[in-house]
Amino acid sequence: MLPFKLIYDHCYDLNLGDHVFPSQKYRLVYERLLHGGIADNSDFLSPQPAKDEDVLRVHTPEYVRKLKTASLSYAEILQLEIPYSQELIEACWLAAGGSILAGQRALQDGWSANVGGGFHHACPDHGEGFCVIHDVAIAIRRLQFDKAIERAMVIDTDVHHGNGTAAIFAGDKNVFTLSIHQLHNYPFVKPPSTMDINLPNGVGDDEYLTILDEHLRKAFSDFSPQIIFYVAGADPYREDQLGGLALTMQGLASRDALVMDYARKNKCPLVITLAGGYARRVEDTVAIHVGTIIAARDAAGKSGSTEAQFTIRGQQSARRPQPPPESHS
């Protein structure tokens, strides 16, 4: 039994045929967590779809109308790069509801994971790059609307820049957006995040971890979040079909541990979303995502009693952020 909740619904798994986006990974992660003895049925919660009012805090009414009435133009559907269907829209609203619920549970338990989500390319008035609506932004805006938090941080380690995240939160001093990504990769127009880490092709474990540690240290020095949304893409993996970095599975596990340590040391609730992952073997992508959940479990174990260790419902006392141990850099 895990010390936090996992959010999942079988509808996350769309039948996309031989599309490069492996939507079956959500089901496979769920099954591996269960059958591997990492989680049991009581650890999982099924979300409700996001309400339209939640989606409309992030996306324009015209875009939402087009999505719900199947009236996107041919060009807009091409920009999504994923087959449009009513099932797709239902799954996206459900994933957004999953990230809302994950945020609520993280504030209660210290940690949570949406076994899905992380659709960081979705912009206010359009979707792109397999991302229809921006579940993380929707969750942050809902938590702010509920006055559960004021300040949030997005740590995006997907190999692709979080352009939708950057566009949605541009100029918002209450949301700190950090994106570490391959520079010469999609998207080709990259609006500025609060902190962008542009990596050249071929960066491997040691260099990546050193750079990420340096920037996380600076980010937590500059900003004191009340919740972290961790967009934990599996695609920096060296065998990823859509990436050009060279991280090993062990390097990705160290990445996860590093991010978790910053959350733990700063007593900040953290939400995992899975984001991208397109390894030649889907089993590799699944293993990386499962490893992220394991990293959260291990970090929660170091924290002791999660509810006692974390600031709940956004009532955060003044403090100086603390870096994790040097051995993780």
Which residue ranges define each predicted feature?
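Metal-dependent C-N hydrolase catalytic cores
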Residues: 2-137
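A general "terminal functional-core" signal
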Residues: 74-329
